[in-house]
Amino acid sequence: MINNTIPSFLKLWESTDVELAVLNQYFTSHPEIFEEYFKYHCPNTNERLSNAIKQYPAKIEDIRIITKTLPIIIQEVTNAYHNKFNFDVKMKFHLFVGGFGSNAFVEREIIGDMFFAAEKLSPNLNHLRVIVAHEIGHIYHNVMLQNNGMDWEKAEWTDAAVNLYREGVATYVSKQIVKGLNESVYYSYDDDGERWLQYYIENEKQIKKRFLKDYIEGWTFEKEKEWFRLSGGQYFGYNRLGYFLGTAFVEYVAQALGESEVFTFWNKHNLKRGVMDWLSK
C-alpha cells in the first residue's frame, strides 16, 4: 500500500506562501510519517524548517515529477522482487516532503513501513529504482532471517556490525534487482557519487581501520551518524562510508560461504566476530 502525501504538500505550496505554521499543518496531518521522521531522521527545529522553506523552490519541479513517478517505480520494483525471489509480502510505503533530513528509511520492524522524502531524491528513474530496491532489500533480508529462525529478541538493531551488515545486504540485493548502472549509483542514488566511490576504493584499508577503532572504543549515535547518515563525513570528508564497508563485507561472505549465506549470516554466525575479523584483514 502506498501512502502518497506529496500531493497534499504541493496543494499547500501552490495555494499560499508557505510559512512555518502552514508547513507544520502538513506535518501534523500525517503523524504516521512525521512522528518517526522527526524522532530519528530530522531535527524538528524552527531554524531547520525555515531553511527547508527556502530550499523548496529549487526542488519543487523534481518533487512534482517524483509524486507521479515514484508510485509507479515502487510497483515495478516490487514486481521485480516477486519475479526474482518469489517475494510476496504486504508492504507499506510512505511518500512525503520533509525538512531535508534522511532521504529514505525503514522502520526497525521485521516488515517495517518504508519512508521516502521527495525533497532529498533524484527524479531520475534509475536512481529512484535503486533507492526503492535498497529499502525493499531490508524487508526481504528480514523475511529471509525470519524464515531461518532468527531470534529477534536478541537483535541489536543499533549495533555497528548489524548496521554495516544490513546496509551491505540491502546494497548487494539492489544490484541484483536493478542491473547495469554505474557502481556509484548503488550508494549515492544519483550521478554525483563517482569521486566518493573512488575515495573509498583508494583508502579502504584506512577506512576499515578507523571503523574498527570506533567499534572497539564503543558505539554511539554520533558514530552512527558519521558512518551511516547523510549528516556524517567528519573523518574523511565523505559521509556514509559504512555502506561501502557493508557491501564489501557482504561480497566477502558471498565469496567465502556462498550467496545463500549472505541473507542468514546474522542468525547462523557470530556477526560481531565476523565483521571484526574482516575489518582486521
Model-based region annotation:
Residues 1-67:
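Non-catalytic architectural context of zinc metalloproteases
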Residues 2-16, 152-206, 210, 279-281:
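Post-HExxH zinc-binding segment in Zn-dependent metallohydrolases
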Residues 53-110, 125-126:
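Auxiliary, metal-adjacent structural segments of Zn-dependent hydrolase domains
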Residues 70, 129, 162, 166, ...:
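Hydrophobic (often cysteine-bearing) scaffold residues that line and stabilize catalytic clefts
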Residues 89, 95-115, 136-152:
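A short mid-domain helix/strand-loop element embedded in enzyme catalytic domains
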Residues 118-131:
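Short pre-active-site segment immediately N-terminal to the catalytic Zn-binding motif
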Residues 130-143, 167-171:
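Active-site recognition of the HExxH zinc-binding catalytic motif
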Residues 202-281:
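Pan-zinc metallopeptidase signature
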